[in-house]
Amino acid sequence: MQNKPSSYDREDLLASSRGELFGPNGPQLPAPNMLMMDRIPLMSETEGAFGKGKVIAELDITPDLWFFDCHFPGDPVMPGCLGLDAMWQLVGFFLGWIGGEGKGRALGVGEVKFTGQVLPTAKKVTYEIDFKRVINRKLVMGLADGRVLVDGKEIYVAKDLKVGLFQDTSAF
């Protein structure tokens, strides 16, 4: 993909969920409700804590988001696993952005720490992904560290997020 955009809006992300952004063999983002971001203001192959790539994405928080009604009734909070999944989504999106093909699958995470929460009163969640290693050969895989911020305050940190792209997932 020559002259790749360095940012994406909601319509672009929805196109990715339909398989229209990175071509017929590229990875897809999930569709709403599991699409956990509204925009990606930064995509870079050279920035980041390790100089191997950086992604910043944002999710606007409103009290009517689907997960607040069910997690938990009377004590609404965004499930931490959705923030973790968003970070995996962004690692896979980056792999498609650099030209990787296949179906994205989360392969693991080394360590996750939760030190805060996303409440319905929040305004914005920001995800920051710093790539440590990217393999784009027969095997397509990304290894990254990530963090989640709510209204500018760090609340989750993930080390060694791992995502791979697979041509065949039947034996996965």
UniProtKB/Swiss-Prot annotation:
Subcellular location: Cytoplasm
EC number: 4.2.1.59, 5.3.3.14
Alphabetical keyword list: Cytoplasm, Fatty acid biosynthesis, Fatty acid metabolism, Isomerase, Lipid biosynthesis, Lipid metabolism, Lyase
Record carries keyword Glycoprotein: no
Keyword Lyase assigned: yes
UniProt GO cellular component terms: cytoplasm
Signal sequence region: none
Pathway(s) where this gene product acts: Lipid metabolism; fatty acid biosynthesis
Gene Ontology process terms (BP): unsaturated fatty acid biosynthetic process
Reactions catalysed according to its record: a (3R)-hydroxyacyl-[ACP] = a (2E)-enoyl-[ACP] + H2O; (3R)-hydroxydecanoyl-[ACP] = (2E)-decenoyl-[ACP] + H2O; (2E)-decenoyl-[ACP] = (3Z)-decenoyl-[ACP]
Active-site residues annotated for this sequence: 71
Subunit structure: Homodimer.
Protein family according to the UniProt entry: Belongs to the thioester dehydratase family. FabA subfamily.
PANTHER family tied to this protein: 3-HYDROXYACYL-[ACYL-CARRIER-PROTEIN] DEHYDRATASE, 3-HYDROXYDECANOYL-[ACYL-CARRIER-PROTEIN] DEHYDRATASE
Name used for this protein in its record: 3-hydroxydecanoyl-[acyl-carrier-protein] dehydratase
Name of the gene this protein is made from: fabA
